[in-house]
Amino acid sequence: AASDVYKRQAYNSYVILDEKTAVMDTVDANFKDEWLENVAKVLDGAKPDYLVVQHMEPDHAANIENFMKAYPDTTVVANTKTFTMMGNFFRNLNLDGKKLVVANGDSLTLGKHVLTFVFAPMVHWPEVMVTYDSTDKVLFSADGFGKFGALDVEEDWDCEARRYYIGIVGKYGAQVQKLLKAAATLDIQTICPLHGPILTENLGHYLEKYDIW
């Protein structure tokens, strides 16, 4: 049931601390206060330079406007399709002078960390992109490689991830294959999805499962 899924779903957002600081995506509207508090704790008085928006589905993008109210000097990083959707979703959001439009393959240097943006259209929305941090060898995979379930519950990844894959991205198999081919060219040691746990070990297993499913 939808309510059961909702009760057992984790929404992830990440912060990269460097000479310039980047926040990766926001979270569902229901967790606005908790999320902003967590971001503030991690920033520890610093101001974020960038908000990277990989995916405009409401459970990840709902707090863009709230974030910009809290940190009005932040530059929003996204692709053209994402900014178009953002304008439709947030009629009162003024990002004049606060946009960084990226194309497929563009990079952004934060200091030691260099982020490269790889477009992944229809995994599972048309504007989706993923982000690769070549310094720490991290793939911020948007909805890819996510799973249902809470983070405080120990459970096998495959079962809930397969259910998630079938329900969320499975119908876009060709697009997933394109993403897997792109991922195969990268030295990935960590996968950070927008749902579920961070994946750090035996990454070939997860890539293989996505190929099979």
Name these PLM-found stretches.
Residues E19, N30-V77:
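Active-site metal-binding motif and surrounding structural segment of the metallo-beta-lactamase
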Residues A78-E201:
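Metallo-beta-lactamase
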Residues I16-E19, L110-G111, D133-T135:
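Active-site beta-strand termini and strand-to-loop segments that position acidic
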Residues A2-Y6:
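Short, small-residue-biased leader/transition segments that mark boundaries at the very start
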Residues D28-A29, P58, G146, I198:
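Short, glycine/acidic-enriched loop or turn micro-motifs at the edges of active sites
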Residues M24-T26, P48-M56, V76-N79, L139-A142, ...:
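Active-site neighborhood of phospho(di)ester-bond hydrolases with catalytic His/Asp-centered motifs
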Residues G196-W213:
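Terminal amphipathic helices with adjacent charged low-complexity linkers/tails
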